[in-house]
A protein has these predicted regions:
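Re-entrant/interfacial helical elements at transmembrane boundaries that shape
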Residues: 61-62, 140-155, 181-182, 194-211, ...
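Peri-membrane helix termini and adjoining interfacial loops of integral membrane proteins
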Residues: 102, 107, 157-164, 202-209, ...
Length: 312
């Protein structure tokens, strides 16, 4: 089925591309705009179906746009070397360092193991730590990492399947389980909005603003509205989940049972300390960039990200 979908996407993209180039541009759209639309259809079909490797699809604009007379090769190449891409690259490498040494898991275990074991408080703790980790690590990776921790905490609070409980309590347990899973997904997205590197979409938005409207948003300027949004939206999402969408109300487990269920993070190693130190320096440099620029002209968010990645 997957191979069939890939072949379908491959030929759908090619046929759509050729057909659009063979037809005149619709009224109100320039010939150049119509050719750009044809390239977009080709790339979209190949991207969504993964008809060819994603890296190859991403390189198509460099080939097709100059051939169709839409833009010159040097103009296209300059976009592939955009500072925003280096911000994404540096931020991604920092996130990978977190993942390699399980620092995100360590933070999560420390917070959740010390959280109030009452179900609603536990749900809020899971959401808070997920949102924090997602500020620095890719949303998908954060979700994959946090779900097992959330499920382990859930297992300590909710009795095993088959345990005899009354129907009302069973409904509360079921709602809590569903809320816990949804909470991780929601918090990952909300936390990802807090920083420019929280999700690639943020960095792309920064690049578009700078290139198209000459509006430059620094790391700290993005955080000035991204962090307050996260701090407001996470509690609101928690309240809606636990009180409206999937209400639950029952006694929780002891803090010891939750700690036993999710496990202990263990002693911190030398490599983890080094990664934490580098990340702390990078984060501080992003925050104090306006001050650092006076001493180090030309320093940018992307430069800081790359320097941090090289140090790792």
């Amino acid at each position: 089925l997957r191979m069939t979908l890939k072949k379908f996407g491959l030929w759908l993209g090619v046929v759509g591309f050729v057909a659009m180039l063979s037809l005149p541009a619709p009224e109100g759209l320039s010939d150049t705009g119509w050719r750009v639309a044809a390239v977009t259809v080709l790339i979209g079909c190949w991207w969504f179906t993964e008809a060819v490797p994603v890296t190859l699809t991403g390189s198509l604009p460099f080939l097709t746009l100059p051939l169709l007379g839409i833009a010159k090769p040097d103009a296209i190449a300059s976009l592939y070397m955009s500072p925003v891409l280096f911000l994404i690259l540096g931020g991604s490498l920092i996130g990978l360092a977190f993942e390699k040494w399980n620092l995100h898991r360590r933070v999560a275990l420390m917070v959740v193991s010390k959280a109030n074991p009452e179900p609603r408080s536990l749900l809020l703790a899971i959401m808070a730590v997920t949102a924090f980790v997602s500020m620095w690590v890719n949303n998908s990776a954060t979700t994959v990492m946090m779900l097992p921790i959330a499920m382990a905490a859930l297992a300590a609070v909710v009795p095993e399947e088959g345990t005899k409980v009354d129907a009302s309590l069973q409904r509360h347990h079921r709602n809590f389980a569903a809320a816990m899973i949804l909470a991780v997904s929601l918090a990952s997205n909300l936390g990802g909005f807090a920083t420019p590197i929280g999700t690639p979409v943020n960095s792309i938005a920064v690049g578009i603003l700078e290139r198209s409207y000459e509006v430059r948003l620094s790391f700290i300027e993005w955080m000035s509205f991204g962090v307050p949004f996260m701090l407001l939206s996470v509690p609101v999402a928690w309240w809606i989940l636990s009180r409206v969408t999937l209400p639950f109300d029952f006694a929780g487990a002891s803090r010891e049972s939750i700690r036993d269920s999710i496990g202990e993070p263990g002693p911190i190693g030398v490599a983890e300390r080094r990664v934490l130190a580098i990340v702390a320096i990078v984060a501080a440099a992003w925050v104090f960039l306006p001050v650092l620029e006076k001493t180090i002209p030309g320093l940018t968010d992307a430069g800081i990200a790359v320097a941090g990645a090289l140090a790792l």
